Amino acid sequence: MSISIRRAKPSDIETIQQFGSKLLNFERENYDASLDSNWALSDEAKAKYLDAIQNKYVIIAELEEQPIGFLIGSIIEPKASDARQIKQAYLQNIYVDDDFRKTGAGKQLVAAFKKYCQDEGVKRLNVSVLAANEIAIKFYNTVGFKPRSLSLSQEL
């Protein structure tokens, strides 16, 4: 079973929207009922995903030419007004279909993004994860992420 990673193309938009919907649905059902899993299928989401394909780093994991997952990431250039003057990247979304988890696809997606970031001179890679999502936290720890900051929120 050989998984390949490739850059996304505009023709992948429906696949990316479906993966995005599955990701939001999983997070809504398990961690945050305020999420709208149908948003990923909207015209607004389509426009954002197309923009990401053209202006960010979007990759697809495939098994025998069938898409099984995706990752969206972006590079953040420091602004002159920033106290921290290092080039950073942000892993925005990662999803692997249920049937293909534990195959290494997620690790390969992250490894490809890390290499891209290193080639672009990025010094720090960041990701945010829901605190209750212990599976994702364990995965991110496995691929080298460590806790750096803590974000707190309060429902009103």
Predicted regions and their residues:
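Conserved GNAT-fold acetyl-CoA-binding loop/helix
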Residues: L24-K48
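Conserved GNAT acetyl-CoA-binding A-motif
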Residues: C117-S128
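Conserved acetyl-CoA binding element of GNAT-fold acetyltransferases
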Residues: R84-D98, L150-S153
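A short helix-loop-beta-strand connector motif used in the catalytic cores of GNAT acetyltransferases and
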Residues: K48-I60, Y90
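Conserved active-site alpha-helix within GNAT-family acetyltransferase domains
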Residues: K107, A131-S149
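Conserved acetyl-CoA-binding loop-helix of GNAT-fold acetyltransferases
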Residues: N93-V96, K102-K115, T142
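Conserved N-terminal entry element of GNAT/NAT acetyltransferase domains
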Residues: M1-E14
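Conserved beta-strand in the GNAT
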Residues: I60, Q66-I75, Y95
